[in-house]
Regions:
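Active-site-proximal structural scaffolding
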Residues: 26, 89, 247, 269, ...
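Alpha-helical support elements that line or immediately flank enzyme active sites
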Residues: 97, 251-259, 289-303, 315
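Short, well-ordered loop/turn and helix-capping segments at boundaries between secondary-structure elements
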Residues: 101, 114, 195-197, 298-302, ...
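Short, contiguous, pocket-lining structural segments
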Residues: 246, 284, 297, 354
């Protein structure tokens, strides 16, 4: 999907003001992909499929999709799976599996789209797109603080194919050409790595290094470690309810969301009111975290609870500044807290949130 369909890879703890409200930053979209069959583009929602389904394995945080289109010469099926690694938080893994019931001329297009959707953007400048053999990398900086970000991407086809790289329409793309044998399945693995200037000194080099390491280890190894890490989390967090399977599923699905957005990758960060689902509520940390989420982590993951509490301690300086700004003594903690305790709440807030 392109920006008009609102895809977003939301960064935790990095904010920027361009126009309007200050909000979290969306990364260049390393998941951008589509298919051509016999020269014709096939993607949703532009081309209606004859069958389509999506599913989420919430126990392991894996998203699956399968889509079949009818073409002029037969049927083509695309199956994908995608996960943000719980074991190595800077990596996203994707797998494409393509099959057809005829000799189809296939072009799989996948890469990085730098034209992303923002509520009040754009938030990135000095955008650079570079290709390196089978890999590619996009670098940029945020407007306000000049924080560097890097998104690297690489693919590996398990079958003979012709590959090209192109830069076009704000995108850097792999074009993978091959011809299907009827009934055969063609698998392409893809890795996306993400680093920022808050993670490391040189995000670009770290992103490329981890990309090469992930390719060497292989998709299946990355997925196995990801699954194993999820199982470790469930040992301490899974809820079992006798006699009410639906209630049990609902509770564990909610726990999946909490586990997905826990900031285990750092030592001082909190969870925004909308998690990492987008830029609504300015990506700010409300007191919802302490009221509704903290108890769960205190009972199941004290190390993460410590990270959440340390965020409040570390934002004391921002609370002191806010109190002084309004003429008060002491500390006045933020209602909509961003980094450093900056309060993103306006003096006169929205009158119609919808």
């Amino acid at each position: 999907y392109e920006a008009d369909r609102l895809p977003a890879i939301n960064l935790a703890g990095i904010y920027d003001r361009s126009t309007g409200w200050r909000e979290p930053v969306n990364l260049p979209n390393g998941c951008f992909s589509y298919l051509r069959v016999d020269g014709e583009m096939y993607r949703l929602p532009e081309v209606r499929p004859i069958s389509h389904g999506i599913s989420l394995d919430y126990r392991h945080g894996i998203f699956h999709r399968h889509t079949t289109w009818h073409t002029a010469r037969g049927n083509v099926t695309l199956r994908t799976e995608r996960f943000a690694s719980m074991d190595q938080v800077h990596v996203i893994g994707m797998r494409f599996q393509i099959s057809a019931d005829f000799h189809a001329d296939i072009e799989l297009v996948t890469g990085i789209d730098t034209k992303v959707w923002d509520l009040n953007g754009p938030h990135l400048e000095k955008i650079s797109m570079q290709g390196q053999q089978d890999d590619m990398v996009v670098t940029a900086q945020t407007h306000e603080e000049g924080i560097s970000i890097a998104v690297a991407e690489g693919v590996l086809a398990s079958y003979p194919a012709e590959m090209k790289q192109i830069v076009k329409n704000h995108k850097i793309l792999h074009r993978i050409f091959f011809i299907t044998m009827p009934g055969e399945t063609y698998t392409t693995d893809k890795w996306i790595t993400v680093f920022t200037g808050k993670d490391v000194v040189n995000p670009r080099e770290e992103a490329l290094h981890l990309l090469q390491q992930s390719r060497t280890e292989g998709y299946d190894t990355l997925l196995e470690r990801h699954n194993r890490r999820w199982e470790e989390l469930w040992k301490h967090a899974e809820v079992k309810i006798r006699g009410d399977v639906k209630a049990m599923e609902a509770v564990n699905y909610s726990i999946y969301h909490l586990q997905s957005i826990a900031p285990r990758h750092t030592d001082s960060l909190s969870i925004p009111a909308r998690g990492l689902s987008g830029q609504t509520y300015k990506g700010a940390v409300f007191w919802d975290t302490e009221m509704f989420m903290l108890d769960f982590f205190l009972m199941t993951d004290p190390a993460t609870a410590r990270i959440l509490m340390k965020y409040r301690i570390d934002t004391l300086a921002g609370a002191l500044r806010k109190a002084a700004h309004y003429g008060y003594e002491g500390a006045f903690y933020a209602w909509e807290s961003q980094e450093g305790g900056y309060d993103a709440c306006t003096d006169y807030n929205v009158t119609d949130v919808f």
